[in-house]
């Protein structure tokens, strides 16, 4: 399957997290806090045009707003 950056997804798109670009400890801890770990399903609910942040749903449960910096460092497979 083709891997895509979360930042390239549009509202309604779904994917499973398969890789991270930034492997710094603070970034990985932040992802863990949000429940965004490898194998996690996410769906893009909305894209904020002002700053390209994304509203996402994680594992059909919780909703989060993630910055463009976060979405540029996460890869998903459909």
Spans of features found by a protein language model:
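Amphipathic alpha-helical interface segments
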Residues: 68-70, 74-78
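Mid-protein regulatory/catalytic core that forms ligand/cofactor-binding pockets
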Residues: 1-70
